């Protein structure tokens, strides 16, 4: 089987590449990535010499290039991780999110229609559902929860999801969609909460926390997410959406305090900054459907996963220190210096 993995040099995509090459050593994995600021080719160094792996630098919006790749590789399955994903950046510049997340998705599905595939899988987010109130811990997102987006990012992902389902109904394209909660683990880009706090804490820099840090997220270890997608593309029902959650709800401030504790850093590093515009209060996923239909359950408890994640960042400091130099510093100063 040949699988095209878009966005495979990013956080979740690269972990999925590693998982698939290990779990299915006879599969051919073709990684397509534009290598934007969040894509890092060095992440894929461990598999570059694998004869069943190929990397192609390509923008999913490049229709001619995508069609050429399909002609060459004749993929059986496409898994689309490629996306602009940082909410703060979407607030600053929505257009690139619409281009990549919606138009890029359309190009990939058009290629699937033109050349024929067994399965197209869209990797999406629980953010398409909006948020839940903090005072209703009994409420969870299900696959039937209406789409109610809060940011340009989540709106672009919701638009892509609706387009995927429309291609299924209109053209009969064999699609599935997964909507995950917040991922964490190795190779997470340092602009996101957990790696940002780890990197800053190690450097004894301020730990910027939006608002009062009361926002709640459901955390999913990236390896568990990869296993869920593996199951969906092999056994998931065509035309269906599957929620993938970690059963690990935590307040942002509690995560930051835990990171301080694990690294032996004082909580005095925590600095409360002006809240994000339209900041969602609580995400919580009900993964009953994927459990009942496919037998998937998250294996990693947050207490264990965060220890593994922190240790990975301690052991791989060159990887993230190379990233946070240069352009990233300009972005960081813009985001946090005057808040």
Q: At which residue positions do the language-model features occur?
A:
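N-terminal Rossmann-like NAD(P)+-binding domain of SDR-like oxidoreductases, especially those catalyzing
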Residues: 1-183, 308, 313-316, 322-339
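C-terminal substrate-binding subdomain of Rossmann-fold SDR/epimerase-dehydratase oxidoreductases
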Residues: 3, 19, 29, 58, ...
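Residues that form or flank phosphate/diphosphate-binding pockets in enzymes
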Residues: 12, 38-39, 64, 188, ...
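Short histidine/acidic/glycine/proline-rich micro-motifs that form metal-
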Residues: 35, 182-185, 215-216, 276-277
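A glycine/serine/threonine-rich, flexible loop-to-helix segment
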Residues: 47, 135-136, 190-198, 274
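Residue-level recognition of oxygen-bearing side chains
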Residues: 65, 96, 103, 146, ...
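The catalytic Tyr-centered alpha-helix of NAD(P)H-dependent dehydrogenases
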Residues: 137, 149-156, 186, 190-194, ...
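Hydrophobic alpha-helix immediately C-terminal to the catalytic Tyr-X-X-X-Lys motif of short-chain
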Residues: 159, 163, 167, 197, ...
């Amino acid at each position: 089987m040949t699988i095209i993995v878009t966005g495979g040099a990013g956080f979740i995509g690269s972990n999925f590449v590693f998982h698939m090459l290990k779990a299915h050593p006879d599969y051919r994995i073709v990684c397509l990535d534009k290598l934007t600021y969040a894509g890092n080719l060095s992440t894929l160094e461990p598999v570059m010499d694998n004869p069943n792996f190929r990397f192609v630098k390509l923008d999913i919006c490049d229709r001619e290039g995508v069609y050429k790749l399909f002609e060459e590789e004749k993929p059986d399955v496409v898994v689309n991780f490629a996306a602009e994903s940082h909410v703060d950046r979407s607030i600053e510049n929505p257009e690139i999110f619409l281009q990549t997340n919606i138009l890029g998705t359309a190009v990939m599905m058009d290629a699937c229609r033109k050349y024929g595939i067994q399965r197209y899988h869209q990797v999406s987010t629980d953010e398409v559902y909006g948020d839940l109130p903090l005072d209703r811990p009994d409420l969870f997102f299900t696959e039937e929860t209406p789409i109610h987006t809060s940011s340009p990012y989540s709106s672009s992902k919701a638009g892509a999801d609706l387009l995927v389902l429309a291609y299924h109904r209109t053209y009969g394209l064999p699609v599935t969609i997964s909507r995950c909660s917040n991922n964490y683990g190795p190779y997470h880009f340092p602009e996101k909460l957990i790696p940002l706090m780890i990197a800053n804490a190690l450097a004894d820099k301020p730990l910027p926390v939006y608002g009062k840090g009361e926002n709640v997220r459901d955390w999913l270890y990236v390896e568990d997410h990869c296993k869920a997608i593996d199951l969906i593309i092999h056994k998931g029902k065509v035309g269906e959406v599957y929620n993938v959650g970690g059963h690990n709800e935590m307040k942002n401030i509690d995560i930051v305090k835990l990171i301080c504790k694990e690294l032996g850093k004082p909580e005095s590093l925590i600095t409360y900054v002006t809240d994000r515009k339209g900041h969602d209060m609580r995400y919580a996923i009900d993964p009953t459907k994927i459990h009942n239909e496919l037998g998937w359950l998250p294996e990693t408890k947050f207490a264990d996963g965060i220890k593994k994640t922190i240790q990975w960042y301690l052991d791989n400091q060159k990887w993230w220190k190379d990233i946070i130099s240069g352009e990233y510093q300009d972005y960081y100063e813009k985001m946090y210096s005057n808040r």
